[in-house]
Amino acid sequence: GLVGSEMCIRDSSMEPGEEQPFSQYSIQVDAEGFRPFTVSGIELFSKQLSLQEVRMDEVDAPGNPVDTIVIPVNTLWGDFPPKIAESEIKPISETGEIVLSRVVVPEYVVVHDGPPNDTTARDYYVRYKDYIKNVASSEIYSTWPDATLRANILAIMSFTLNRVYTEWYRNKGYSFTITSSTAYDQKFTYGRNIFQSISDIVDEMFQNFLSRPNVSQPILTQYCDGERVTCSNWLSQWGSKYLGDQNYEAIEILRYYYGNNMYINTAEEVSGIPASWPRVDLTIGSTGEKVRQIQEELARISRSYPAIPTVTPDGIYGPATREAVEVFQRVFGLPVTGVIDYRTWYKISEIYVAVSRIAELV
């Protein structure tokens, strides 16, 4: 871990101003048998513990290992596009898709590192808690009052879980959970440092989200900085800081912005990346987005399990898809039917997450 430097004036993170409220450092890590690893732009605040994780690749690691990370500045200081307004509750019937039957905290989210339609951007498989810590460390200052940090983290988590619950991007034909674009979602920076004060709160509260009465989905709690960009009925990041200074509790801060009928709710944890089963078995003749999704997952799995034939993700369940499903079922000890039922759907999802995660770590 990296300990905050006293060179930085603590008060400059307490109100907007001309002085950058954090110092920035670079580190290089060297270890015998591993490629050198460099991180630049690590942010340090006075009296704050900053934590930097480094994953090093062996010298002869295959592929194209990442060995340099450049961390952009916090969104409160830097110039990032403002959030494009959306409705906070999604009309599920619009897509005709069955969404997740309950609110869950996924083990992993898939983060698309760019705007949704940027096909060159990488997708990262990130543990949910690590994702929330990363976003909060990118969006707000760790020096702020505890209640302010909690209110902002709750808004970040509820926003994320709405994307998970509604399968927002999957239903638009994408294969990720959320993007790193501030115009569409929230700031995420692969490999950035996080802050102990934020990390501790996320570890304590990660199963929470924000609810309104008689609404099953987590609320898409949008927010803005409140200084350069103002937003009615959304949380103001700087405004929430001033309310924290006035000893408002986290829920009081949230109700100040989102209204008095906002409540803190609790979700259950699940493993992997949840994606809803279409409620009907997929078999020869089935077509559509769910078929294409499962074909993409099988295609990725077949790279790690070559016995499974490669399928073309065309959204049509033909003989080649049935054959791939039969081999998958045989390999993983399921009844060999060539039909994707509930058990097979979730087993494919589980194995897909596992092989994708291993690829991220290699």
Placement of each model-derived feature along the sequence:
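Short, small-residue-biased leader/transition segments that mark boundaries at the very start
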Residues: 2-8
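Conserved, single-site charged/polar hotspot
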Residues: 5, 24-362
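Short glycine/proline/serine/threonine-rich loop/turn segments at secondary-structure transition edges
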Residues: 10-23
